[in-house]
């Protein structure tokens, strides 16, 4: 009689340390997994935003063979969705074999129907379902970090390298912050100038509390000590991912933005990290051009959808023409009011 058990799908309980430890061990070892597959996102989504989470894992004979973190968003403004993963650039299934991968996706589709979701979205880095509707708006930028600091500097194209050297010449400095205070002030002001709502400060504090040393804030200051530019980054295995950033209006003239990313790369090199993940950008935008100018090549992201109660993929992004008037109005709103109102909107964008 065989002792082989059937593959099972279960839901992660964040209250069970042994389950969390097994999940985390699998994610750290699975080549297909990313920082956004980590178990801590379940806590962040629930405690900061109040969203229901379904962190599914496939296991057999006591071994996890795949994970699929899902978050459910119910919004009168933006609809009802089940996504892997809200507020993340990557997601979908991370599995060690096709059986686990297929079983998790099938379970997610059934779960979405049971919940009455309008759509299921899986944010894949590789195409999984050519026959599913897909969002082709986003690309990611990743590049290897050379072992030597000077080689990384020389790998930056001439124009942007000159900006880095300008920042150095102007006496800009960088420091790792113990709090999110300076970062949030720069971030909130920055997104307000662009006409988009800001996440609440407690979200960034929750990221720091949840992920510890794997979530770090680096802030660049002028020679006189004025904070100019800041970035909150994630560390995963041998990679660094600058994820949220903010700049003072004076940062551009002082080359603080280029200097900031150089300092992050330089420090990552010193730590022996291998990959600089510049993150997601929309095709044709300023951030897209900025990363290209740094010598990074875009790679398409495959955000694939199952549509249940809608006919087309939702376009809840600033490129949507129907949001242009709202963006202009948001820019004119006083910053304290925008910081108060923003979290009520952004929690549902995902």
Task: Kindly label every feature range from the protein language model.
Residues 6-61, 68-78, 124-253:
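A conserved beta-strand-loop-helix scaffold within acyl/acetyltransferase catalytic domains
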Residues 84-92, 136-143:
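Acyl/amide activation-and-transfer machinery of modular secondary-metabolite enzymes
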Residues 56-68, 75-77, 88, 96-111, ...:
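Aromatic (often tryptophan-rich) hydrophobic motifs at membrane interfaces
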Residues 85, 154-163, 317-324:
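Short intrinsically disordered coil segments
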Residues 2-6, 72, 126-151, 273-274, ...:
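Active-site/acyl-donor-binding loops of N-acyltransferases
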Residues 99-140:
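Non-catalytic accessory segments adjacent to catalytic cores
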């Amino acid at each position: 009689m065989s002792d082989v058990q059937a593959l099972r799908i279960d839901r992660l309980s964040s209250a069970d340390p042994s389950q969390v430890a097994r999940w985390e061990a699998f994610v750290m070892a699975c080549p297909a997994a990313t920082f956004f597959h980590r178990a801590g996102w379940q806590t962040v989504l629930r405690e900061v935003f109040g969203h229901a989470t379904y962190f599914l894992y496939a296991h057999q004979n006591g071994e996890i063979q795949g994970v699929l973190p899902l978050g459910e968003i119910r919004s009168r403004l933006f609809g009802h969705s089940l996504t892997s993963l809200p507020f993340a650039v990557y997601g979908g299934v991370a599995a060690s074999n096709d059986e686990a991968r297929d079983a998790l996706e099938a379970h997610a589709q059934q779960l979405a129907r049971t919940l009455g979701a309008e759509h299921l979205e899986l944010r894949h880095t590789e195409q999984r379902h050519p026959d599913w509707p897909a969002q082709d708006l986003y690309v990611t930028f990743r590049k290897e970090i050379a072992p030597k600091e000077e080689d990384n500097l020389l790998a930056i194209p001439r124009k942007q390298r000159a900006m880095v050297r300008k920042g150095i010449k102007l006496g800009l400095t960088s420091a790792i912050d113990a709090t999110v205070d300076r970062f949030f002030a720069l971030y909130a002001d920055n997104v307000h100038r662009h006409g988009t709502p800001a996440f609440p400060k407690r979200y960034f504090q929750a990221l720091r509390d949840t992920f510890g040393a794997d979530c770090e804030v680096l802030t660049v200051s002028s020679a006189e000590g004025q904070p100019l530019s800041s970035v909150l980054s994630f560390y995963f295995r041998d990679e660094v991912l600058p994820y949220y950033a903010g700049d003072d209006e004076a940062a551009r003239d002082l080359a603080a933005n280029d200097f900031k990313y150089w300092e992050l790369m330089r420090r990552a090199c010193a730590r022996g990290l291998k990959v600089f993940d510049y993150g997601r950008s929309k095709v044709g935008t300023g951030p897209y051009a900025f990363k290209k100018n740094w010598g990074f090549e875009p790679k398409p992201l495959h955000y694939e959808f199952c549509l249940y109660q809608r006919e087309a993929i939702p376009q809840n992004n600033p490129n949507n023409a129907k949001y242009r008037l709202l963006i202009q109005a948001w820019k004119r709103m006083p910053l304290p009011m925008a910081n108060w109102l923003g979290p009520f909107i952004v929690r549902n964008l995902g």
